Structures are given as structure tokens and as C-alpha cells.
Amino acid sequence: MPKPTTLRTTQDDARENQQIAKFGLAAREGRSNKYTPDADLLCEGAQYEVELKTSDVAKKQISTARGVTFKKIEEWRKVQVWIFSQYERPNRLTGENYVLFPEQMEPYYKKLEDKIQKGTKKRAGLDDWNYAKSALVAIGFDNTVLNKLDYAFNHKGCALNDPKIPWSYVATNGTRVSSAAELREIVKRYYSRQGFTNREQCL
């Protein structure tokens, strides 16, 4: 279990600190190269992993992460609770908050996976690389170099650079929430319907 704390330590975490305080969450300590959710929600003996995101009220979109690959999406799929909050610059939350669960996030994940696999009008996807790789294999291209290229395309080359989540997606698919008590009631109700009674069952 992560060590609870109610304060993140960098200035960039100012909005997350407000979310953590508002909803009575336990923050994860610091940041590292390995992905970890932002906080934990404790509710009647159960612990839920929480990802915190904010959206500039003027821009109406949410930043996610750099270098999003299939691996990152699979990590996101394990997150049990997503909380989204709007803010006005510099860092004042407006009071508009939504909670989303895995099934509400799944269409977004699938959209990202489709872009990684198929590409877009301007950028290649893994399907394009696999087509090119087949042609290189057919002409006897050096296997060592080919393996390096394959690794690069699968782990970096076709990654998405900070794909945004539209605020409209959050508002349409999420449940509005205004307090720590209300959040816990929504989470408890959702996971009770799913037949989950504790954190381990939800993973």
C-alpha cells in the first residue's frame, strides 16, 4: 500500500493538490519513470486507485501523457477511478468535477489504440510499419537492423504525443461529483453493481 500523503511537492501539482484535498484522497508520493496512478481512494475498507486530470475551462480538453503506446493504455485500463476537474488560470478549480470508471473510459482507449495501429492521414501506424517490414524481409534486409527498427516502431515510433481528451467526452460519459462523500457513494454504488467488494477484485 502506498504511504498516504495529502500534499504533492512540485508547483505543477497545485491543481492535483486541490483535487486531493477536496475529495479526501491519499496522494501517491512523487513521480517516477514508472507509471503509477496519482492517488488512492479509501472507502469502507476498500482501496481504489485514482487518476487525476484537469482541464483549462477555456481550452476544453485534457492533456494525458507523452509517448502513449499500447503499454500505457493497458496501464490506464487498470485504473479504477478517474476524476476530472475544470480550472481557470492559473490554478483555481471551478467546481465542475466528473468521475469516470473503466467502462466509460474504454471507448477512448479503443480510439487511441486504433490510431496507433492504423495511423492517421499524416502519420504512420503499426499496420504501415508491418507492411514495410514484410517488404524488407522479402528483399533480405539485415535482420539485426530490422529487429531494431521493429522495436523502435512498436515502442516509440508509433506512440501518440499527448493525445487529448475532449471535455465534452468527460461531461457526456461521466458522473458529476461535488464532494468527498458524494464521490465515495458513487464509487461504492458502481463497484457494487460490478460485483466487486475490494480493491484486489477490481484489478
Task: Please describe what each predicted stretch is.
Residues 1-37, 42-203:
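Nucleic-acid endonuclease domains
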